């Protein structure tokens, strides 16, 4: 897992997300606390439970982006899910326990990559021997089986050429394991164990024998390394480590949690809102979930929930779930200055993306300071007058602004454009000032 300090985590998030320091600090501390907990004695460690987070803020201010960037920094099993995708147990739709099953699958993949990385050197040696065997087949007759000095020397010559890349383009016939055909079975509620057993049965039935293929040595070497590394990984140890990783370091990001709040007085079962909240309770509090890899305890999994709460309030969540999300963080609405920073400061910012895209056609595009100010102001004004969709408004405004250049770029190779205040005014003023037009076009 990540050993980064909270300050380092915030610094990494700053490279991609403008503002929202409170939210960044909260997730940074939560991530660091995962590491701190693992430094404690085993007995005391069990008593330290994660403090789950609820992020509240309007749409388009960076809630989901924080989750995306955090996933890359965490170096731990991480899953982002939309709360609206789930229904109460017993009804058609996904059950919330599927979150933990998917998280376990992610952990299996992560652990497999780590273990295969550790035994990569041995896998390369085995792959090298298999390629040399294909290049220099061993004699089939028993009386010729003793390796002579000349054949040994020839093998060493070919080994040297192989390592230097001189044989990369040479084609060989080699036996390569066939990919397994997966069978997806939709399981009825409460019958996941039977479904897993059926899937295992089909998986074993569908194992095809190795197929002889003709390919270049460079391609064959990559395939054989993967194949040999997979053979060296102990599957039982892999499952144990993955489950341990989920239980101790797993992070679940629940997006759009405000959409499962109960709205007004409704009669009948609310299976996709309050029902989902009730099902989430044991998951967030701590329970045991059955997966095809084994039993997974959720007691120490960190849950980060987020929602815009425009049509509802955090207090509309059922009280038990509110209590299980003790840390509340409010994200601020974006100002015109924030828009300006979003256009220029982050790594691979929106302006940099358009400059790079047009450069592929031989067209040089430059954004002046006044142009960036005007774009930011236009996006902010449209947000204020119509629906506030946050930074996503910049994508709409920029696409409309660059529409003519993008369309004609292939015919204007070698030309240059400067996007200044006058250019922005000429292309956007009518749309921004006309509220009806901006509602439909921007």
UniProtKB/Swiss-Prot annotation:
Superkingdom assignment: Bacteria
What the entry lists under SUPFAM superfamilies is as follows: P-loop containing nucleoside triphosphate hydrolases
Disordered: annotated segments = 136-157
Originating gene: hslU
Q: Name one GO biological process term.
A: protein unfolding
Keyword Nucleotide-binding (UniProt): yes
Which GO molecular function terms does the record list? ATP binding; ATP hydrolysis activity; peptidase activity; proteasome-activating activity
The record's subunit annotation is: A double ring-shaped homohexamer of HslV is capped on each side by a ring-shaped HslU homohexamer. The assembly of the HslU/HslV complex is dependent on binding of ATP.
Q: What does the entry list as the binding residues for ATP? A: 18, 60-65, 255, 320, 392
Major site of localization recorded for this protein: cytoplasm
Q: Where in the cell is the protein located?
A: Cytoplasm
* Disulphide bridges, residue numbers: none
What name has this protein been given in UniProt? ATP-dependent protease ATPase subunit HslU
Function statement: ATPase subunit of a proteasome-like degradation complex; this subunit has chaperone activity. The binding of ATP and its subsequent hydrolysis by HslU are essential for unfolding of protein substrates subsequently hydrolyzed by HslV. HslU recognizes the N-terminal part of its protein substrates and unfolds these before they are guided to HslV for hydrolysis.
Similarity comment: family membership? Belongs to the ClpX chaperone family. HslU subfamily.
**What organism does this protein naturally occur in?**
Shewanella baltica (strain OS185)
CDD domains membership = RecA-like_HslU
Keywords annotated in UniProt: ATP-binding, Chaperone, Cytoplasm, Nucleotide-binding, Stress response
Cellular component terms per the entry's GO annotation? HslUV protease complex
